[in-house]
Structure formats: C-alpha cells, structure tokens
Amino acid sequence: MTTAGLKAEGVSWDLSELYSGPDDPHIEADLAEAQRWAEAFAQAYRGKIAGGQLDGPGLAKALAEYEALSDVSHRPSFYASLLFAAETQNTKVQQLVQRTREAATETANLLIFFSLELIAVEEQQLAPLLTAPEMAEYQHYLETLRRFKPHTLSEKEEQLLNQRNLTGRSAFEQLYEELSGSLRFRLTVNGEEQELTDGEVMALLRQPDRTLREHAFTVFLETHAGHSLVLTSIFNNLLLDHKVECALRQYDDVVLPTHLANEIAPQTVEAMMQAVERHYPLAQEYFRLKARLLGFDRLKNTDLYAPIDAQAEAIPFPQAQTLIQTSFGRFSEQFAAIAADFFTRRWIDAEVRGGKRGGAFCAALSPRHHPYVLCSYNGTGRDVATVAHELGHGIHYWLSRRQKLLNYDAPLVLAETASVFAEILLTRHLLAEAQSPAVRRSLLC
C-alpha cells in the first residue's frame, strides 16, 4: 500500500489556465482591475435599485456586469486557494493567500451595497422588474438571496464583519490547514519505520491486519494530541465566531444559516434526522454482520473500514481511471468523456505528498473555467470511490456551465446527490463484474 506506483505519483493538476505561478504579474493586474472595476460599478449603481431607477432590462444588465466583475475579482484568491491546498507549507503560497484574501475583502466591501439593495427592495417594487425576459435567469438567485433579509446587517456592519474575518474565521481555518499539512506520523509498517502523511495513515485503517489498524489509529490520535493546545484553540474560536455572528444576525438556531444556504427547510432536515434515528437498528445489524464476517465478537472503531476480503489487491491509479470511466460509460458516453478530460487534461491532483491538505474536494470558479479535483490516492477501493465522488461534482459543474454565475454553485443537498450518484455508478459496475459471491460481499461490506 505504500509503494510509489500505487499513489498516483506525478498526477498533479495544471493550473496554468488561471495563472503561470504565484509570481505571475497577471495576479496583481487582476487585483487592481477588480478594485478599479468595483469602484466604477459602485459609482454607476449605488442607490439605483433602492431609488427605483432601474427597469427590468437595466437590472439584468447590472447583474450581468456584477457577474463578470465577480469572475475577475475571485480568480486570484481561487488560484491561491488551489495552490495552498496542494502546498500548505510553501511560504510564498501562504503569502499569496493572505494578499489575495485581503484584496478580495476590499473588493467585496465595495460591492456589498449591491446585494444589500437587492435584499432590501420591497416586493412590490421588485415584482414588475422580474417580468422582463432578461430577468428570467436571475429569479432563483434573487429568491435565495432575499431569504437572508431578516438576518442582514447595515452596509457598515457587513463590511466590518468581512474585515474581521481576515483575522478571525479565515485566519483560524488557514492555521488549521497549515498545521495539519505539517504533521507527519511515524509508525512501523511491515517491520519498516515509516513517516507518513495523514492520508497515508488513514488508508492503513483499510488494511486487513487488525494490529496495524489499531497502531495506525493510535499514532494518528497521539500525534494530534501533541498539538492539542493549538487545535483546541482553533476549534473553540471557530465555534465562538459562528455563535457571535449568529447572535448579531439574530438567528434563533446556529444551524439556520446552513439551512438557508442549502435552500432547505429546517423541518425537512429534522424529518430526515428522525428517520435516520428510527433506523439505527439497521446500521447496528450491519455492524454485527461485519463482525461475524471478520471473525470478531465485537467491532472496534478501527474495524469499521476493515476489508472483508483480506486478499484484496491495491488498485493502481491508471486502473482506477479505467474503472471509473468504464462505470460512467455504462450510464452515459458523455459522462465518461467528461471524466476522461479530468484525467488527460490534468484537472486532478491525486499524488500523495507531504504538505498537501487532507481530504478531497472539487472546486470551480465560474462557468468560464473547468473545475479542479484534489485528493490523495493511496490505492484502496475507498480511494477509487473518492475519485468517482469528486468527479461526480466535477461533471455536475461542467454540465452547469450554461447557468449564470450567480446560479452556478449548487446547494450542498443537490451537489452531494451528483457525487453520490457517481459512486453508485462505480459500485454497480463493480458488482456486475464481480466473479464470485466473496468479491460481491467485499464490495458491499
């Protein structure tokens, strides 16, 4: 599991479509252009919505310019965030993250009047504007935005919160990523002392050797415990930051901002949670079944991801690519073709290396740019599913290019449907190709 050939060696993304590197002069040029454009936009449109000086076509034109400006203003910070995810210990990248974040905040504060006016305008004043054909594609955005009206502050207060985030939430999130990316885990694997990344250690929890799994988990916890003071401070401050902002915005419940962003009613989430709780016995029966298949009386937490098939071989990254494209192709040739672009055009960073942030994600800037996927591929079946999952997001973004920028990002409950669907396609393909009941059992358990 720790041989280089399994770990997508050399599979890194190409970000040159955005910028050539952290020193690219186009970054500063775009930051300056965004600032200049935002000032001009504010001069042109401040007070126009509140004052009723825009008709439907005029508002659509303003929204279109706002989208174009947002694309330019977000590009430097988006690029910096991708660089940082791949190289959390690179000081030049860290500096770029801070520089672009500060510039993005300045630009956002110049533009915040626009969304505030869209939120504040009375329904009877807005309704006639929405009848213009040019406004049809912006109605969903406006409906979603205006749901936040009871929790929106004054322009000055919103600007202060944005500035506070530079040394508050955003700063603590970056500190966590830098600290996590710096951690190394020393343990013995197959008689050999190794220094592993967090992704490599977590991959060991899917090894058939129970002792190795327990050892890996112990080292993982102990290494983090060595930094418990900093980690505890980070988590507590993030919780307090969220609590304070919810109080300022007069939310009755700290989860309500998430529900609004996800465009889902709290009652729906509560109903789902209750349904899950009612079916706890089903999950418990699964765990009892897995314990029997593994030959244990009871499962430990380190057994949850243990493979049923102890002889299962690691999966090289090229084989994972073939499995994913084939499984997607059984559903749709277009699905498979889009996925192929991620592999062949270097839209994926899958290599395991020190300093890379943990976990996996798919990120997209705008309909004008293709998405990017990051993961750390260790050759497990779960890693194959993770790549498929993130490609589900990527394909969803790709197919959403016809949308306006303001409608481009899907709420979480919709976005995860696309990614889990991609995992289902992979699983169904593997089950269909399974040569024995034992293989099918290992896929299901």
Predicted regions and their residues:
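A well-structured
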Residues: 1-310
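Active-site recognition of the HExxH zinc-binding catalytic motif
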Residues: 250, 378-397, 419
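Long, K/E/R/D-enriched contiguous segments that form extended
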Residues: 289, 293-330, 336, 373, ...
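Short pre-active-site segment immediately N-terminal to the catalytic Zn-binding motif
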Residues: 312-317, 368-388
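Catalytic zinc-binding patch centered on the HExxH motif and its immediate surroundings
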Residues: 313-315, 348-370
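Post-HEXXH active-site segment of zinc metalloproteases
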Residues: 385-386, 397-420
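An active-site-proximal "capping" alpha-helix that borders the catalytic cofactor pocket
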Residues: 391, 414-427
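Long, amphipathic alpha-helical stalk/connector segments used for oligomerization, subunit docking
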Residues: 428-445
